[in-house]
UniProtKB/Swiss-Prot annotation:
Record SUPFAM superfamilies: Epsilon subunit of F1F0-ATP synthase N-terminal domain
Described function: Produces ATP from ADP in the presence of a proton gradient across the membrane.
Keyword Membrane carried by entry: yes
InterPro entries: ATP_synth_F1_dsu/esu, ATP_synth_F1_dsu/esu_N, ATP_synth_F1_esu_C, ATPsynth_dsu/esu_N
Gene Ontology cellular component list: plasma membrane; proton-transporting ATP synthase complex
Assigned protein family: Belongs to the ATPase epsilon chain family.
Gene (name only): atpC
Complex and partners: F-type ATPases have 2 components, CF(1) - the catalytic core - and CF(0) - the membrane proton channel. CF(1) has five subunits: alpha(3), beta(3), gamma(1), delta(1), epsilon(1). CF(0) has three main subunits: a, b and c.
Protein name: ATP synthase epsilon chain
Entry-linked PANTHER family: ATP SYNTHASE DELTA/EPSILON CHAIN, ATP SYNTHASE EPSILON CHAIN, CHLOROPLASTIC
Topology of this chain in the membrane: Peripheral membrane protein
Entries under CDD domains matching the protein: F1-ATPase_delta
Taxonomic lineage from the root: Bacteria, Bacillati, Bacillota, Bacilli, Lactobacillales
GO molecular function terms noted in the UniProt entry: ATP binding; proton-transporting ATP synthase activity, rotational mechanism
Keyword vocabulary terms for this entry: ATP synthesis, Cell membrane, CF(1), Hydrogen ion transport, Ion transport, Membrane, Transport
Length: 138
């Protein structure tokens, strides 16, 4: 069976490294499904839930919360360089819930002061927190 090596790398080190038969990521243009022997690509990534179907483990699916970055696909090696990333099993849900509440509070506060930059920053923080919460439930 043809397979790909999938690595997710952050400034903190390698967060994921396994062989896969399928992965799904989200770019600014939408969702992208990747199978072995995919054409070489470099693309930006959105904050999203990355789905990985592993090789040799019947229907084993791993989920990784990706918080932006880029993907490079070359010669059956998929490398994702992300600002931050967490596997579903590693997510501290209570910390993510606190981040969600903090971001919601920051959005409300920034909207009352009409601070557009702070609203945008808080919305990104909210998207990241919600992404982590959603991935933790997979």
């Amino acid at each position: 069976m043809t397979q790909m090596t999938v690595q997710v790398v952050t400034p903190d080190g390698i967060k994921y490294d396994h062989h896969a038969k399928f992965i799904s990521v989200t770019t600014p243009d939408g969702e992208m499904g990747i199978l072995p022997n995919h054409i070489n690509v470099i693309a930006p990534l959105q904050v999203h839930e990355m789905k990985i179907r592993r090789v040799g483990e019947d229907d084993r699916v791993d989920w990784v919360a990706i918080n932006g970055g880029i993907i490079e696909i070359k010669d059956n090696v998929v490398t994702i360089v992300a600002d931050s990333a967490e596997r579903d099993r590693d997510i501290d849900v209570s910390r993510a819930e606190r981040a969600k509440l903090r971001a919601e509070r920051d959005i409300a506060e920034a909207e009352t002061t009409h601070d557009i930059n702070e609203v945008q920053r808080a919305k990104v923080a909210l998207r990241r927190a919600l992404n982590r919460i959603n991935v933790s439930k997979k």
